[in-house]
């Protein structure tokens, strides 16, 4: 345990920030999982695109808040869009 007053405050502040960051991370990870589950359940194109838009916004917000690094945000979005685009291509080929 810290003895110095400023060190005690740093402990309080860092714990508060850790919990806030954890909430942002959980939020965007859940949005990504929703998209992947929609793809797995073969949801319609509109539903998948709407969920993808929400996931992208959640990732961007986490990046802007400094919860994750901008490169990690870009990588997560790229991998998500790769899966979404692959799913949309399979939808188009099955409709033809």
UniProtKB/Swiss-Prot annotation:
Keyword annotations of the record: Ribonucleoprotein, Ribosomal protein, RNA-binding, rRNA-binding
Presence of the UniProt keyword Ribosomal protein in the record: yes
InterPro entries associated with the record: Ribosomal_bS20, Ribosomal_bS20_sf
An example molecular function term from Gene Ontology annotations: small ribosomal subunit rRNA binding
UniProt keyword Acetylation present: no
GO cellular component, one term: small ribosomal subunit
Pfam families: Ribosomal_S20p
Stored HAMAP family: Ribosomal_bS20 (MF_00500)
Family: Belongs to the bacterial ribosomal protein bS20 family.
Role of this protein: Binds directly to 16S ribosomal RNA.
Protein name from the UniProt record: Small ribosomal subunit protein bS20
Naturally occurring in which organism (per UniProt): Thermotoga maritima (strain ATCC 43589 / DSM 3109 / JCM 10099 / NBRC 100826 / MSB8)
Phylogenetic lineage: Bacteria, Thermotogati, Thermotogota, Thermotogae, Thermotogales
Originating gene: rpsT
